[in-house]
């Protein structure tokens, strides 16, 4: 699965948030005020996402409606694995060390991580 540029990911996040087929107008209304895009730019992103296999397009009257083919969880898992592979040599330990050594993990984060690991161990 290909990594999406930030602009296309922003569009996909909106579509995933709706969790149903959406129109360009609905996408446009959800974009940040600071980041207003022209209708043609949005349509261009939607066309690219369709070409990449992320979206399918159907008609609802005169309007095109866009549905996600790839769900958010699948994309996030693939991207997480890609980041882990590229930046941390597939090492979860190296990834966590970077977070911890950079003071990006709070005590609460560590407790949640311990609880998650314990839950995974019990399921094995």
Q: Locations of the language-model features?
A:
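Short alpha-helical segments that sit at the start of domains
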Residues: 1-18, 74, 123
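Short, cationic-aromatic polyanion-contact patches
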Residues: 4-5, 60-79
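Short amphipathic alpha-helical elements of helix-turn-helix/winged-helix folds
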Residues: 14-18, 30, 116
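Short acidic, hydrophobic short linear motifs in intrinsically disordered regions
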Residues: 21-31
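Short, hydrophobic-biased segments on the C-terminal half of alpha helices
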Residues: 43-47
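Glycine-centered, phosphate/nucleic-acid-interacting loop/turn motifs that mediate DNA/RNA or nucleotide
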Residues: 53
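Short beta-strand "wing" residues that participate in macromolecule-binding interfaces
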Residues: 57
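Amphipathic alpha-helical dimerization/coiled-coil segments
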Residues: 78-121
């Amino acid at each position: 699965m290909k990594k999406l540029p930030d602009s296309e990911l922003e569009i996909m996040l909106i579509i995933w948030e709706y969790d149903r087929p959406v129109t360009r107008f609905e996408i446009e209304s959800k974009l940040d005020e600071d980041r207003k895009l022209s209708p043609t730019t949005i349509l261009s992103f939607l066309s690219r996402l369709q070409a990449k296999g992320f979206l399918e397009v159907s008609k609802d009257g005169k309007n095109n409606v866009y549905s996600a083919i790839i769900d958010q969880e699948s994309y996030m898992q693939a991207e997480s694995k890609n980041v882990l592979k590229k930046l941390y040599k597939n090492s979860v330990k190296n990834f966590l060390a970077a977070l911890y050594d950079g003071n990006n993990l709070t005590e609460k984060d560590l407790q949640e991580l311990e609880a998650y690991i314990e839950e995974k161990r019990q399921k094995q």
